[in-house]
UniProtKB/Swiss-Prot annotation:
GO molecular function: DNA binding; transposase activity
Pfam name, any one: HTH_Tnp_1
The keyword Transcription regulation appears for this protein: yes
Protein's recorded name: Probable transcriptional regulator SyrB
Role description: Responsible for the repression of SyrM activity.
Sequence ranges of Low complexity compositional bias: 7-23
Length: 148
C-alpha cells in the first residue's frame, strides 16, 4: 500500500503523457476534417466548360466582326458582349476554316500585272533621271570648288 500512495513523479509524467497524446490526435483529426471540407468546396466550384459547335463559333465571330465594323464598340467590348473570352476569340479566329473566311482577291492578277510592269518601267526611268541630275550637280560643284 505504501507504493500506491507514493506515486509522485511517475504519476505526474503519465498524466502529462495522457494529456498530450489526445491533444495530438485531436489536431491531426481536425486537419483531416479541414482538408476534406476544402476538397468538397473545391469540387463544387469547378464548372464544366461549354462547348460551341462550328456554326455557333462562326456566328459569334461574325457578330463580333459586325459590331467592330459598324463602330458600335471596340473589339474587347464586342468579345465580352458575345460572352466569350479574348483568348477564345483569337483561338477560334485562328482555327476558322479557310472556306469560312471571305475569299481575298489576289494582288497580282490580269490587269494588275500589266499595271505593275508599267510602274516598274516608270520607276526605272525616274531613277535614271535622278542619277543624271545628281551627276550634273556634282560636276558643277566640283568646277566651283576647283577640284577638277
Amino acid at each position: 500500500m505504501a507504493d500506491e500512495s507514493n506515486t509522485g513523479p511517475v504519476a505526474a509524467a503519465e498524466a502529462v503523457a495522457e494529456t498530450q497524446a489526445p491533444a495530438g490526435k485531436r489536431k491531426s483529426s481536425s486537419r483531416r476534417q479541414r482538408t476534406a471540407a476544402g476538397q468538397v468546396a473545391e469540387s463544387k466550384t469547378t464548372a464544366k466548360p461549354k462547348r460551341y459547335s462550328e456554326t455557333e463559333r462562326a456566328d459569334k465571330l461574325n457578330l463580333i466582326e459586325a459590331e467592330v465594323a459598324q463602330g458600335n464598340s471596340t473589339l474587347k467590348d464586342a468579345i465580352k458582349s458575345a460572352g466569350i473570352s479574348e483568348q477564345t476569340y483569337y483561338v477560334w479566329k485562328k482555327s476558322a476554316k479557310p472556306a469560312d473566311r471571305k475569299p481575298e482577291e489576289s494582288v497580282v492578277a490580269g490587269d494588275d500585272l500589266a499595271d505593275l510592269i508599267q510602274l516598274d518601267k516608270e520607276n526605272l526611268r525616274l531613277r535614271n533621271l535622278l542619277s543624271d541630275k545628281l551627276r550634273a550637280e556634282n560636276a558643277e560643284l566640283r568646277k566651283r570648288l576647283g577640284l577638277d
